[in-house]
Amino acid sequence: MDFSFWNNKKYRYGIIGGVVLLITVIALAIRLLPMGDLVGTGDMIAGPDAWYNLRLVEVLLASGGFISFEAMTLFPYGQDIVWGPLFTYISAFFGMFAGDAGRTALIDAVSWVPAVLGALMVPVMFFIGKKLGDWKTGLLAGLFIAVVGGQFFSRTLYGHFDHHVAETLFSTLFVLCYVLGLANLNGKEISLKNPSSLKLPLIFGVLSGIAYLLSLLTM
């Protein structure tokens, strides 16, 4: 069999990209398995945290803003909300697709969030593996994160409506940006006397900082 086409970067990158996409779809499909038991029931599987996250989304959709103080807890004083708003805003975006169809439809919509964010870990892990090794390492890393069990899998299931998956995704995205920065700057001379040598450090520094900030905004 002639594999000469593999020497063509266009075809090689297309095939590898297609495999990454396929693994991502498989990761999402696995995480959507609980849908059959949850859709239309108005139920979720993450305990009380899921219901409080739902409250934050409902308040955001109703008022247009994230509440920084919760008057309904620590009675009679209330208390500050100490974690970031990013997961709530992402979930509210999904919730908008439910329209004005009621609370059950909203729950069905936001229940997609952990599954989608969990599946997005596949391309992130692929690029980390590819940069640290090669494309085969990247595919193995993506496949591993798609099917690995334990806490990561359970917290990325449809209906496990909690913010931990967002913490994992954005902190791993920070690692990717950091690794890319180190790899691209390896062996390059950086000097304050040569402004052009500062371009790449600034670009990767900013990207890493943004990814780090996004992870903090989910914690």
Regions found by a protein language model. Give the residues of each.
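Start-transfer (signal-anchor) and selected internal transmembrane alpha helices
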Residues: 1-37, 48, 139, 202
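Membrane-water interface regions at transmembrane-helix termini and the short interhelical loops
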Residues: 1-6, 120, 124-132
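Membrane-interface starts of transmembrane alpha-helices
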Residues: 8-15, 102-113, 134-141
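Glycine-rich, flexible loop segments associated with nucleotide phosphate handling
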Residues: 14-17, 45-47, 105-109, 193-208
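Membrane-embedded helix bundles of polyisoprenyl
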Residues: 23-30, 113-128, 137-218
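Membrane-interface coil-to-helix junctions
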Residues: 23-121, 162-165, 169
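Structural motif corresponding to the C-terminal cap of alpha-helices
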Residues: 64-65, 97-101, 133, 151, ...
